[in-house]
């Protein structure tokens, strides 16, 4: 019999908890997203994360460890190479990435790809470099409005991003161009993990703002995951936020797109009112997109405080046979140099109202403990060539 009827996994996108032994190989030294956020503010109130045991797991300024935490918790190491969104999420559900996704951070995209993209879309391309979304819009937004040229850029991730003004370039046109870019970047020499449509509004430098109509065109996972195992065996596999995009719809039975991280939590609370058996997998992207990449630790702290308020509502709604897992997919230390993700441990906090014990568990060798635990709970076999050790038996 299933131990839990519903498992809610909430990914606080980029909430790393300290460097790994190989972080230096990724250019990350003394990185610690959570601790450095807490050190950047005069006060930091996250009472619900606190009572679950987050400060027992990892030092947080202004937040004391509690004597009797509610959750079972552990650190998780990333087994895959990389520190990006797809790698982290795919690993959670059992896939280990052995070869890093190709990046074009230092070189920009090859001219042959740009020529083909211009020819197929009918738009001249500008940009073609690594930049933050804010920077590239300040530099080229006005130019696009005047000319209709297409802004193409990348980051330290394996991404090709296209900006389009919603009113002058058009949302449908932006999506059309991204679909062409996705088709072209399936070729091995040009392959990227994701093509991302980045719509925005505003008419002049300093006033441009990205909208919530972003769309990710991801590669399909190279193999089946825990999500496929759930769906194929008749269980619900509900996604909130960009989860559906990250897995290109594979293994998803219901998709809910979020306008913000607060909206994502509101959607989760609504889903909690429904009867289902299976998984609800939630990604809250604003922590990463709005605060981590933009190196804004104060904004990050405030977003965490907002999340904590909604977390309290989630805790109140949990049933005896529900399990809540809180985790992250990588780090993005907003006090660190540059604008890139940071390779860090991530937290694993697991709580159910039916638990009688709690406390620290041994560090997991991969993020895949999550998928393995979910699969064991529902009695489904993890697909071939997946990794991960379940901790279900410890969640008592």
Swiss-Prot record:
Catalytic activity: 2-deoxy-alpha-D-ribose 1-phosphate = 2-deoxy-D-ribose 5-phosphate; alpha-D-ribose 1-phosphate = D-ribose 5-phosphate
Keywords: Cytoplasm, Isomerase, Manganese, Metal-binding
Enzyme nomenclature, EC number: 5.4.2.7
Single GO BP term: 5-phosphoribose 1-diphosphate biosynthetic process
Gene Ontology cellular component annotations, sorted alphabetically: cytosol
Cofactor: Mn(2+)
Pfam family, one: Metalloenzyme
Binding residues annotated for Mn(2+) 2, in chain numbering: 288, 293, 341
CDD domains, per database record: PPM
Location in the cell: Cytoplasm
Pathway of action: Carbohydrate degradation; 2-deoxy-D-ribose 1-phosphate degradation; D-glyceraldehyde 3-phosphate and acetaldehyde from 2-deoxy-alpha-D-ribose 1-phosphate: step 1/2
Gene Ontology MF: a single term: manganese ion binding
InterPro entries referenced in this protein's UniProt entry, alphabetically: Alkaline_phosphatase_core_sf (IPR017850), DeoB (IPR010045), Metalloenzyme (IPR006124), Phosphopentomutase_DeoB_cap_sf (IPR024052)
Binding-site list for Mn(2+) 1: 13, 329-330
Domain of life: Bacteria
Comment on bound cofactor: Binds 2 manganese ions.
Biological role stated in the UniProt entry: Isomerase that catalyzes the conversion of deoxy-ribose 1-phosphate (dRib-1-P) and ribose 1-phosphate (Rib-1-P) to deoxy-ribose 5-phosphate (dRib-5-P) and ribose 5-phosphate (Rib-5-P), respectively.
HAMAP family: Phosphopentomut
Annotated family: Belongs to the phosphopentomutase family.
Name of the molecule in the record: Phosphopentomutase
């Amino acid at each position: 019999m299933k131990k839990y009827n519903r498992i809610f996994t909430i990914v606080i996108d980029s909430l790393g908890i300290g460097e790994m032994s190989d972080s230096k190989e990724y250019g990350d030294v003394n990185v610690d997203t959570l601790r450095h956020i807490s050190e950047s503010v005069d006060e930091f109130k996250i009472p619900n994360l606190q009572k679950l045991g987050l400060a027992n797991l990892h030092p947080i300024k202004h937040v004391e460890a509690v004597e009797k935490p509610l959750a079972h918790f552990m650190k998780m190491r990333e087994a895959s190479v990389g520190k990006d969104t797809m790698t982290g999420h795919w690993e959670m559900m059992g896939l280990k990435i052995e070869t890093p996704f190709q990046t074009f951070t230092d070189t920009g995209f090859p001219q042959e790809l740009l020529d083909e993209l211009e020819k197929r879309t009918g738009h001249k391309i500008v940009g073609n470099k690594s930049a933050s979304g804010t920077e590239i819009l300040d530099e080229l937004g006005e130019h696009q409005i005047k000319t209709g040229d297409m802004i193409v850029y990348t980051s330290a991730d394996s991404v090709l991003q296209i900006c389009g003004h919603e009113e002058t370039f058009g949302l449908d046109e932006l999506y059309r161009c991204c679909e062409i870019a996705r088709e072209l970047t399936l070729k091995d020499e040009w392959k990227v993990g994701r093509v991302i449509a980045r719509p925005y509004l505003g008419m002049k430098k300093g006033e441009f703002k990205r909208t919530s109509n972003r769309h990710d065109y991801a590669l399909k996972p190279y193999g089946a995951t825990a999500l496929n195992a759930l769906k194929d065996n008749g269980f619900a596999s509900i996604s909130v936020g960009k989860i559906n995009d990250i897995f290109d719809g594979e293994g998803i039975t219901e998709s809910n797109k979020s306008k913000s991280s607060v909206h994502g939590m509101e959607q989760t609370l609504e889903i909690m009112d429904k009867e289902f058996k299976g998984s609800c997998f939630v990604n809250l992207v604003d922590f990463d997109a709005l605060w981590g990449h933009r190196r804004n630790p104060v904004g990050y702290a405030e977003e965490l405080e907002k999340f904590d308020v909604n977390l309290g509502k989630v805790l109140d709604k949990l049933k005896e046979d529900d399990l809540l897992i809180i985790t992250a997919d990588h780090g993005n230390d907003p006090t660190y140099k540059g604008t890139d993700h940071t390779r860090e441990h991530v937290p694993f906090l697991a709580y159910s109202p039916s638990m009688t014990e709690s406390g620290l568990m041994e560090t997991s060798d991969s993020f895949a403990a999550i998928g393995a635990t979910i699969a064991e709970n529902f009695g489904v076999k993890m697909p071939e060539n997946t990794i991960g050790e379940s901790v279900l038996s410890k969640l008592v």
